[in-house]
């Protein structure tokens, strides 16, 4: 449709296949309809379309919308397809692209897709946080904590679950921060140098639910940092999920800390006894996939000159897949975590394994016997080297003497330092493992969750208010085009 006046020959069929984005454009089909409606209303406001012309074009857009996206459209992309289909319905469709380029059109569609899916991801993360908080409230029992995947110090499962929570909490914050930067309108920037038509860009932005415009016309069409940032948000969230998924795999096997729900497990095609953590493994794998998308997007974007380049088209499928796939993954994770059964009889039994109370024993020597910490560390290290997981006072005194330190440690002090429950409860500092401190953190995070849900509703409401304005303006012309 666009080539006929400039090109003498049609595009090579294989080149056309390479250049076509129609396969992926279904992701922005409805957004493009909305962008077209907003642009038509802006043209009418500027006096470039009569009321009747605007009505006919919007009616045609409604018909195209109701007919749905077609992958067999013989067009290069969805933008050309919609314009061509509208023009078949009304000759006024030829005026729809006045004062506009596909450059600002596609950038607007992408921002609308990204903002909606960032909010979807943020909501899924909030649901996951809710699940983790509820699990933590009921899981104050002991478990071993790890460094280097080796038994390190005892902790509470509730404390461990809050670590998951706080990691994902930052992913929520990143999604909201990215949304605020994404939710700006490029519409009206045209190819890159703006347009000679007097078009109200702020009005167009409001119609589409944006909270402002990307002011500089060249920056508006030349920049895809919002695509990279959105994919990064997804990639970082998937990294968080992958770390938890890895522990689910580990804890459901030889550790025996958890029992996986049947709904999130599979069996073997040959070994009937198997109950495999396939879904957790797939969550783990998808982190690599989304991180790969991020790398691909950055490598496509790097060193592209200003302003628009067709290279950008190859970033779009990476954006679509990353946000949609991550949203699904977080939803699956939340559902799985909600149904996982923890086995406290096993976690509590293993909480003291690997001389997990060694640090407490060293701290006891410092606080009660005035031994410098580094020397206390050496004394307890000597006990560990002798594989004494439950040393007596005599063992401690002998190890100290070997290192040239004369102390007379009492049995009751050693026994208290080796008491796993007391060790965990003794850590009541800010962020620590004592039950009271964990309960305080749970209460604070429940309050934060409530505030975040309110914020999310507010942001969604602001977008909907803008789109309601668009729908109302279309209704004034006699067209109900709610998307």
Curated annotation (Swiss-Prot):
Keyword DNA damage on entry: no
Reactions performed catalytically: 2-(N(omega)-L-arginino)succinate = fumarate + L-arginine
Domain of life of the native organism: Archaea
Keyword Cytoplasm: yes
GO process annotations (BP): arginine biosynthetic process via ornithine; L-arginine biosynthetic process
Pathway(s) of this molecule: Amino-acid biosynthesis; L-arginine biosynthesis; L-arginine from L-ornithine and carbamoyl phosphate: step 3/3
EC main group: lyase
Subcellular location: Cytoplasm
Any one Pfam family match given in the protein's UniProt record, by short name: ASL_C2
EC number of this enzyme: 4.3.2.1
Any one GO molecular function term: argininosuccinate lyase activity
Keywords: Amino-acid biosynthesis, Arginine biosynthesis, Cytoplasm, Lyase
GO cellular component: cytosol
Cross-referenced PANTHER family: ARGININOSUCCINATE LYASE
Family membership noted in the UniProt record: Belongs to the lyase 1 family. Argininosuccinate lyase subfamily.
Record protein name field: Argininosuccinate lyase
């Amino acid at each position: 449709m666009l080539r006929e006046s400039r090109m003498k020959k049609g595009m090579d069929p294989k080149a056309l296949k390479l250049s076509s984005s129609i396969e992926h454009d279904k992701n922005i089909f409805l957004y493009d309809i909305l962008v077209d409606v907003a642009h038509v209303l802006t043209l009418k406001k500027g006096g470039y379309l009569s009321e009747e012309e605007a009505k006919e074009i919007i009616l045609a857009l409604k018909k195209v919308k109701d007919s749905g996206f077609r992958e067999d459209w013989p067009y290069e992309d969805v933008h050309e397809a919609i314009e061509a289909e509208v023009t078949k319905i009304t000759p006024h469709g030829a005026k729809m692209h006045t004062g506009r380029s596909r450059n600002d059109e596609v950038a607007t569609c992408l921002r609308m897709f990204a903002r909606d899916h960032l909010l979807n991801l943020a909501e899924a993360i909030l649901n996951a946080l809710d699940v983790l908080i509820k699990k933590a409230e009921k899981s104050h029992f002991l478990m071993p904590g790890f460094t280097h995947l080796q038994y390190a110090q005892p902790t509470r499962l509730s404390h461990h679950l809050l670590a998951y929570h706080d990691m994902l909490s930052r992913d929520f914050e990143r999604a909201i921060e990215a949304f605020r930067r994404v939710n700006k309108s490029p519409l009206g920037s045209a190819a890159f140098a703006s347009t000679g038509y007097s078009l109200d860009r702020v009005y167009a932005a409001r119609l589409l639910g944006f909270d402002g415009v990307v002011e500089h016309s060249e920056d508006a069409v030349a920049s895809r940092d919002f695509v990279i940032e959105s994919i990064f948000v997804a990639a970082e969230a998937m990294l968080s999920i992958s770390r938890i998924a890895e522990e689910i795999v580990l804890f459901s096997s030889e550790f025996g800390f958890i029992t996986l729900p049947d709904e999130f497990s599979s069996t073997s095609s040959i070994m009937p006894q198997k109950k495999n953590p396939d879904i957790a493994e797939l969550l783990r794998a998808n982190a690599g996939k989304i991180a790969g998308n991020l790398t691909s997007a950055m490598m496509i974007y790097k060193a592209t000159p200003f302003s628009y380049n067709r290279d950008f088209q190859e970033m779009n499928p990476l954006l679509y897949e990353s946000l949609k796939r991550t949203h699904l993954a977080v939803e699956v994770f939340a559902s799985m975590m909600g149904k996982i059964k923890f086995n406290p009889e096993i976690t509590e039994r293993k909480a003291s394994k690997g001389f997990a109370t060694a640090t407490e024993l060293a701290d006891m020597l410092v606080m009660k016997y005035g031994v410098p910490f580094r020397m206390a560390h050496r004394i307890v290290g000597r006990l560990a080297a002798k594989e004494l997981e439950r040393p007596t006072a005599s063992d401690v005194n002998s190890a100290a003497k070997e290192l040239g330190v004369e102390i007379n440690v009492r049995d009751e002090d050693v026994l208290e330092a080796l008491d796993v429950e007391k060790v965990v409860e003794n850590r009541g500092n800010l962020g620590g493992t004592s039950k009271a401190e964990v309960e305080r953190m749970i209460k604070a995070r429940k309050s934060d969750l409530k505030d975040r849900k309110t914020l999310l509703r507010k942001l969604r409401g602001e977008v909907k208010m803008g789109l309601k304005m668009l729908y109302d303006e279309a209704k004034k012309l006699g067209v109900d085009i709610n998307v």
